[in-house]
């Protein structure tokens, strides 16, 4: 029987303690080895919480699937901030460029239901709203409208999804 352990771990810094150790221990796998593999696969997400799925089959073979961090975490990493605004709408904590929004949208490609880059970019911009992050110096909602109106089409030219 295959067992699956899902956890949210710090990128590149998972450890054998909770939540991984107690969940993997009863499965009889080498926890240290699994944690090392997870850290290797998540090191690019240093400082962010990363969803991982550890799949252990009957023969104790381990497969590790790494998801992408939450959109808010990716935005904070791009901006170099620790947290969003506690007073969104009146307090701005950062400004993100449209190219950074596109970069995050590409990273989230596998995890979203959108069918194209533009729609995923709008989702990323939507996450900026409650965080107090502006896009290209204006409120994120206004940037979403500008995206719909084609203002950033030159950036997206030739982009395949």
UniProtKB/Swiss-Prot annotation:
GO terms for molecular function: large ribosomal subunit rRNA binding; structural constituent of ribosome. The lineage of its organism: Archaea, Methanobacteriati, Methanobacteriota, Stenosarchaea group, Methanomicrobia. SUPFAM superfamilies: Ribosomal L11/L12e N-terminal domain, Ribosomal protein L11, C-terminal domain. This is Large ribosomal subunit protein uL11. Forms part of the ribosomal stalk which helps the ribosome interact with GTP-bound translation factors. InterPro entries: Ribosomal_uL11 (IPR000911), Ribosomal_uL11_C (IPR020783), Ribosomal_uL11_C_sf (IPR036769), Ribosomal_uL11_N (IPR020784), Ribosomal_uL11_N_sf (IPR036796). Keywords: Ribonucleoprotein, Ribosomal protein, RNA-binding, rRNA-binding. One of its GO terms (cellular component) is large ribosomal subunit.
């Amino acid at each position: 029987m295959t067992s699956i352990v899902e956890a949210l771990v710090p990128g590149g810094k998972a450890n054998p303690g909770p939540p991984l150790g107690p969940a993997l221990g009863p499965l009889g796998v080498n926890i240290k080895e699994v944690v090392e593999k997870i850290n290797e696969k998540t090191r690019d997400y240093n400082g962010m919480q990363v969803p991982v799925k550890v799949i252990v089959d009957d023969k104790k073979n381990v497969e590790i699937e790494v998801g992408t961090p939450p959109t808010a975490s990716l935005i904070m990493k791009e901006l170099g901030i620790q947290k969003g605004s506690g007073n969104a709408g009146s307090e701005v904590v950062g400004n993100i460029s449209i190219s950074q929004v596109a970069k995050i949208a590409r990273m989230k490609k596998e995890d979203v239901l959108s069918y194209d880059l533009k729609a995923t970019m709008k989702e990323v911009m939507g996450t900026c709203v409650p965080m107090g992050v502006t896009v290209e110096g204006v409120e994120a909602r206004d940037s979403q409208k500008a995206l719909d109106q084609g203002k950033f089409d030159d950036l997206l030219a030739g982009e395949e999804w």
